């Protein structure tokens, strides 16, 4: 006697009834890039079709569209006019993400604003903190990250997302937030962030390629699974409220490993290179794009992700509404 597993696959409705993993619009976070400008700018990025650098007014229109589709959270990255060795723009109370957050909250008070907390977009060298002897100084960078975090919390950001991969960044930020009275501001840590070539197109849109070297001395070696788990569990101990794995597609084993070892919510970042590959395949009619897109997102959830940060968020929301 053998089990006839095909019985439950015989119709679309039956397959839907027994489906174990389901996508929901609430799963998605849309990354947005806000550029400092006095005029209305919306620049499409050639390596990421459908992704834009936007000044505040176009950004607000984009938020309106996202809210209309049911998306409840955005992740903001800032692109300043001025960059210097210490990323001083990020320590200004009127820096671009702080200003954008205040404007978003005036119009869409229920939209969750998550702010990426790093310095690579603000430094002229493209590294994620203060340089010392051609290397990023861990502890000096923690101090300015705390200052940036406090400015963003004051501007109304709902969640802070430190992405710098400095040791101790979550504990340092949590202490600074609590001391300033921001006890209820959650930290979404980029807890397991790999030094990945999948980030290539992001550096086009964020104008943040390193001017020398790479980020392998602080971002993780993609060959290491045990260290990947250790990084996330360490951030949990330090007080992270949400953990993250970045990139996504080639790292689902890491997502599953972390999911099996924590009860915290787990985010997954579907990064620029992954987005660009699907878009290129769509352009050349190599795949059924919509089908592959939904399959990919479903597999992210199946691996254990509770939320998905994706440049496809708006497309997926449209597909889910249609289906």
From Swiss-Prot:
Record field: catalytic activity: 2 5-aminolevulinate = porphobilinogen + 2 H2O + H(+)
Biological process (GO), any one: protoporphyrinogen IX biosynthetic process
Superkingdom per UniProt: Bacteria
Residues that bind 5-aminolevulinate 2: 272, 311
Binding site for 5-aminolevulinate 1: 203, 215
Residues the record lists as binding Mg(2+): 231
Catalytic residues of the enzyme: 193 (schiff-base intermediate with substrate), 246 (schiff-base intermediate with substrate)
Quaternary structure and interacting proteins, as annotated: Homooctamer.
Record protein name field: Delta-aminolevulinic acid dehydratase
Species whose genome carries this gene: Helicobacter pylori (strain J99 / ATCC 700824)
Gene name per UniProt: hemB
């Amino acid at each position: 006697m053998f089990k006839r597993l095909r019985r439950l696959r015989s119709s679309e409705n039956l397959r839907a009834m027994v489906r174990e993993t389901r996508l929901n619009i609430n799963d998605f976070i849309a990354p947005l890039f806000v550029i400092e400008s006095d005029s209305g700018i919306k620049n499409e990025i050639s390596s990421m079709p459908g992704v834009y650098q936007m000044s505040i007014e176009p950004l607000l229109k984009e938020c309106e569209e996202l809210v209309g589709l049911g998306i409840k959270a955005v992740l903001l990255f800032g692109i300043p006019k001025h960059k210097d060795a210490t990323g001083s723009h990020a320590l200004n109370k009127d820096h671009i993400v702080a200003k954008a957050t205040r404007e978003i909250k005036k119009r869409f008070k229920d939209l969750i604003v998550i702010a990426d907390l790093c310095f690579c977009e603000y430094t002229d060298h493209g590294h994620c903190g203060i340089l010392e002897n051609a290397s990023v100084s861990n502890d000096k960078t923690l101090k300015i990250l705390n200052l940036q975090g406090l400015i963003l919390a004051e501007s109304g950001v709902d969640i802070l997302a430190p992405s710098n991969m400095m040791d101790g960044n979550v504990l340092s930020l949590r202490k600074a937030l609590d001391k300033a009275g921001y006890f209820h501001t959650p930290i979404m840590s980029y807890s397991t962030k790999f030094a990945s070539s999948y980030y290539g197109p992001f550096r086009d849109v964020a104008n943040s390629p390193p001017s020398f070297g790479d980020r392998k001395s602080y971002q993780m070696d993609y060959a290491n699974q045990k260290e990947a788990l250790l990084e996330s569990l360490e951030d949990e101990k330090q007080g992270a409220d949400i953990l993250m794995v970045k990139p996504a597609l080639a790292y689902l084993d890491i997502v599953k490993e972390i999911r099996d070892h924590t009860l915290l919510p787990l985010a997954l970042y579907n990064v620029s290179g992954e987005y660009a590959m699907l878009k290129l395949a769509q352009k050349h009619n190599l795949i059924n794009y919509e089908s592959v897109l939904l399959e990919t997102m479903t597999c992210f959830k199946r691996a254990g992700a509770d939320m998905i940060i994706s440049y496809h968020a708006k497309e997926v929301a449209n597909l889910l509404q249609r289906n």
